[in-house]
């Protein structure tokens, strides 16, 4: 089986979506009967083994990210790679290109709602765009054969936009990296924490949509037993 992922979130600067795709890729290639390709934004058309970069415009307010504009080019190259399944990991041009290529090839397409577009637009632009954003999300994700969400919260957001069937697919935890055997007692002592105190760690990008002020307020309310 030939599986293809496409998203503008697969860049050197990206985080969770790239981690998800890389983890999935490793699992697929271990099967031995599956090939996997990634189509991502770049400065020009460039083929590097299983990775294909296609032209996209740099985003001044999001360093490291590029936004594709050439829907026709993206869809034709994706179709030319002849995948059996296409998964789109964003709600932008790559998603529309994935759907168009899937129709050309008569293969299934999957939309993974990694990025909460509705909340992003609501907070950064204004609630006056809420109806239009919901209509856009509904129109886009109705075009996929399957819609995935990484959490129940995101799935409920899609339901509010009019998407009926959404499969919740948690991204999971890397158990090789995160396990009790890797605990370092010296780390707690270096922070001046007792054995009874709870240590909470946030690992992620410090961007607005991560709602870090909410996390900090939660920590304040939890009190001195939490660090």
Kindly give the residue locations of the regions a language model identified.
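N-terminal subdomain of nucleotide-sugar transferases
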Residues: 1-45, 49-55, 220
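Active-site proximal beta-strand in glycosyltransferases
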Residues: 3, 85, 102-120, 148, ...
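Nucleotide-sugar donor phosphate/pyrophosphate-binding loop at the beta->alpha transition
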Residues: 108-110, 119-139, 149
């Amino acid at each position: 089986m030939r599986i293809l992922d496409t998203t503008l979130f697969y860049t050197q600067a990206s985080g969770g979506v790239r981690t998800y795709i890389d983890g999935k890729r490793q699992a697929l290639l271990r099967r031995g009967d599956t090939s996997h390709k990634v189509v991502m934004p770049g400065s020009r058309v460039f083929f590097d083994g299983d990775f294909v970069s296609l032209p996209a415009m740099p985003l001044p307010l999001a360093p490291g990210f590029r936004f594709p504009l050439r829907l026709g080019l993206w869809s034709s190259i994706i179709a030319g790679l002849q995948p059996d399944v296409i998964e789109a990991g964003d709600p932008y041009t790559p998603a529309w290109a994935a759907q168009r290529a899937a129709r050309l090839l008569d293969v299934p397409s999957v939309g993974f709602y990694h990025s909460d577009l509705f909340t992003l637009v609501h907070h950064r632009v204004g609630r006056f765009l809420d109806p239009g954003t919901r209509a856009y999300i509904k129109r886009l994700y109705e075009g996929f054969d399957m819609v995935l969400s990484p959490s129940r919260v995101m799935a409920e957001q899609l339901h509010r936009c009019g998407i009926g069937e959404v499969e919740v697919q948690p991204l999971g935890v890397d158990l090789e990296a995160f396990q009790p055997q890797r605990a370092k007692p010296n780390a707690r002592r270096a922070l001046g924490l007792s054995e009874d105190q709870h240590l909470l760690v946030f690992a992620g990008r410090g961007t607005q949509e991560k709602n870090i002020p909410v996390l900090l307020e939660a920590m304040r309310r939890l009190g001195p037993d939490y660090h």
